[in-house]
Amino acid sequence: TGVQVVAPIQLDALHPDSSGRLSFDPKVVYDQYNDTFLVVYLVQADSPRLSLIVAVAIPDATASNTGTWCPTSFPGDAFPGSPRLWADYPGVGYNDTRVTITTNQFTFPSSTGRFRHSQIMTIEKTGLYDCTQPAPMPTVFGGTKTRDTNGFQSFTLRPAETVGSS
């Protein structure tokens, strides 16, 4: 309805792992399948080296009650076998059962970071949207799995937001 229901909140206040660290690149989508807003943002620190992807599910019906919000964090460098990398340029998409988050992966430190590869993280909604459920375990693709048909590394992938019954 366009009416503000909650006062502005700093990103680093949405999840305890964000506190006192650089929180950036927020993305917000409305998941019509579950009547839930999803806020995704990144957290990064050079010392000690840290990279997180934070997702906060906000049920539309109870959005004014921040106690019903469900924050979850994932390692920003979740691709197995990868050197320590930090995530940047997130993209967010969803369908009726999963949320997909894409990022570009850079080397530390951030001031001289070099692009390594794109990362695709797909997560079942159950634990992501309901904090009474066990934390979800994402499926992650990166490295050679995110190359284009010519063998080049993809850059800034964007997952789809599906609408409708299929």
Feature-to-residue mapping (PLM):
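C-terminal PAP-associated
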Residues: 1-166
